């Protein structure tokens, strides 16, 4: 098997692009697709103050390495939402990558906002899915940190499979509001909302995994145990099966949506500032502050 670009022995075969590549040209190919996404969707510039949210997983840490390699100045943020051994391992991996990249790493402990409780403990207390609580907490703290520290954009490791599965779910349920706003870049719609960008949207998840492996990038091998049973995994499975039969269909599906889409509508009706914390919300009190109140109320009811 020879590299399509140079004729040297190939390291990988990418069925969805019908090409075979050596390690050097594979890296170049993946990195160029990241650069293409950044420029095509006007995510940020060379002088932007960029904050990447890292979890320790293959996507965020690989993107971290790519952005540094492409010449962008990037600081990283790790939100510690639990106390488990996996969370500790994730933090160690993130710290190792920060050392390798000589990059500033910020760590925010989410449990400090909930009297020391992890998202898992809050989930049990309130009888709500962990993913729901974790999402609320991470989105809020990510934006809060970025805004208060003057960052121009927050970057996340969402890949093509992530975005295509969300798109499929939104179409199947006719979530018109979400379909209107789904885009690789969410611009600023309020002074206290920092833009969010997804530079990996043109890259398949399996290619990011290959990139991390070939380049020996430290990352968590296992997925979050609480994601088991998530609806998004059902949509990903459907797309994987389609991809087996028709290589490239996931990319065509997502790009077709972006190409045919009219100007995205990012404005959110009724956006105002939370009366508790002052951050944007569509309700009187934002979901993060409501969550804090619910936890505080439940803790006060629990006998010592």
UniProtKB/Swiss-Prot annotation:
GO cellular component, as recorded: cytosolic tRNA wobble base thiouridylase complex
Positions with a binding annotation for Zn(2+) 2: 274, 277, 286, 289
Residues annotated to bind [4Fe-4S] cluster: 131, 134, 224
Keyword Calcium applies: no
EC number: 2.8.1.-
Annotated Zn(2+) 1 binding sites: 3, 6, 22, 25
GO molecular function annotation: 4 iron, 4 sulfur cluster binding; ATP binding; metal ion binding; transferase activity; tRNA binding
PROSITE patterns for this protein: UPF0021
Cofactor binding note of this UniProt entry: Binds 1 [4Fe-4S] cluster per subunit. The cluster is chelated by three Cys residues, the fourth Fe with a free coordination site may bind a small ligand, such as exogenous sulfide, thus acting as a sulfur carrier.
Cofactor: [4Fe-4S] cluster; Mg(2+)
Binding site for ATP: 53, 79, 138, 157
Gene Ontology BP annotations: tRNA wobble position uridine thiolation
Pathway assignment: tRNA modification
Keywords: 4Fe-4S, ATP-binding, Iron, Iron-sulfur, Magnesium, Metal-binding, Nucleotide-binding, RNA-binding, Transferase, tRNA processing, tRNA-binding, Zinc
CDD domains: TtuA-like
Reaction catalyzed: 5-methyluridine(54) in tRNA + hydrogen sulfide + ATP = 5-methyl-2-thiouridine(54) in tRNA + AMP + diphosphate
Enzyme class: transferase
Function: Catalyzes the ATP-dependent 2-thiolation of 5-methyluridine residue at position 54 in the T loop of tRNAs, leading to 5-methyl-2-thiouridine (m(5)s(2)U or s(2)T). This modification allows thermal stabilization of tRNAs in thermophilic microorganisms, and is required for cell growth at high temperatures. Can use free sulfide as sulfur source in vitro.
Quaternary structure, from the entry: Homodimer.
Family: Belongs to the TtcA family. TtuA subfamily.
Note: In TtuA from T.thermophilus, the sulfur inserted into the nucleoside comes from the C-terminal thiocarboxylate of TtuB, but there is no TtuB ortholog in T.maritima.
Descriptive protein name: tRNA-5-methyluridine(54) 2-sulfurtransferase
Species this protein is from: Thermotoga maritima (strain ATCC 43589 / DSM 3109 / JCM 10099 / NBRC 100826 / MSB8)
Lineage: Bacteria, Thermotogati, Thermotogota, Thermotogae, Thermotogales
Record gene name: ttuA
């Amino acid at each position: 098997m020879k590299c399509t670009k140079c004729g040297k022995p190939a390291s990988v075969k990418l069925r969805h692009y019908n090409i075979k590549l050596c390690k050097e040209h594979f890296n170049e190919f993946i990195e160029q697709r990241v650069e293409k996404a950044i420029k095509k969707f006007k995510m940020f510039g060379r002088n932007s103050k960029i904050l990447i949210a890292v979890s320790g997983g293959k996507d965020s840490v690989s993107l971290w390495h790519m952005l540094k390699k492409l010449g962008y100045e990037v600081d990283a943020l790790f939100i510690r939402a639990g106390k488990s051994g996996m969370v500790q391992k994730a933090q160690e991996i993130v710290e190792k990558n920060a050392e390798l990249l000589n990059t500033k790493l910020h760590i925010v402990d989410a449990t400090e906002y909930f009297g020391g409780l992890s998202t898992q403990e809050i989930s049990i207390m309130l009888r709500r899915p962990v993913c729901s609580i974790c999402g609320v907490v991470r989105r809020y703290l990510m934006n809060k940190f970025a805004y208060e520290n003057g960052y121009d954009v927050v970057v996340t490791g969402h890949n093509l499979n992530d975005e295509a599965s969300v798109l499929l779910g939104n179409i199947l349920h006719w979530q018109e509001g979400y379909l209107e706003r789904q885009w690789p870049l969410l611009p600023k719609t309020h002074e206290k909302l920092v833009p969010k960008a997804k530079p990996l949207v043109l890259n398949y998840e399996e290619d990011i995994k290959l990139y991390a492996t070939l380049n020996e990038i430290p990352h968590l091998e296992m997925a979050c145990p609480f994601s088991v049973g998530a609806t998004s995994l059902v949509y990903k499975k459907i797309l994987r099966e389609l991809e087996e039969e028709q290589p490239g269909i996931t990319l065509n599906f997502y790009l077709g949506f972006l190409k045919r889409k009219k100007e995205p509508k990012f404005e959110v009706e009724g956006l105002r500032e939370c009366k508790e914390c002052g951050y944007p919300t569509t309700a009187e009190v934002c979901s993060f502050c409501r969550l804090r109140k619910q936890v505080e109320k439940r803790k006060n009811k629990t006998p010592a």
